[in-house]
């Protein structure tokens, strides 16, 4: 009787697990984040003074053969400070991505309702996509840009500025006006 019960239990386990083994084999590790962070909060300082703060509701890190990257699918917020630790710049986007290539190159991309504010100059810039060249300390886009300031309104295609949005230049302006 014990032998029949044991044989039945073994047969049941082998039969019930048989169809599920293929599911584990089909999992592609490149499509699954290796790290997930909820309510991410980063502060960058130099000599004890805050330079930058970044926040995101969710960060997902992925690893590939040629690069690793972090995705921020639920929004990304960056705050830049002056040397006197006064809040100067805000960058807000629906989504962002930070690419790190194995050869050492890096690229930050913000996309979807990107808003860049320089609070000191009272300038607001809106675009769909923004890139940050961290090595050269520049932000830029090739997309349509609107910029509001106390001096007027500008719009055009393509923009470049230092990373604090202090010196924004719109490359192909049109229908702009000054006050």
Residue locations for each model-derived region?
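Mature-chain termini and adjacent capping regions
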Residues: 1-179
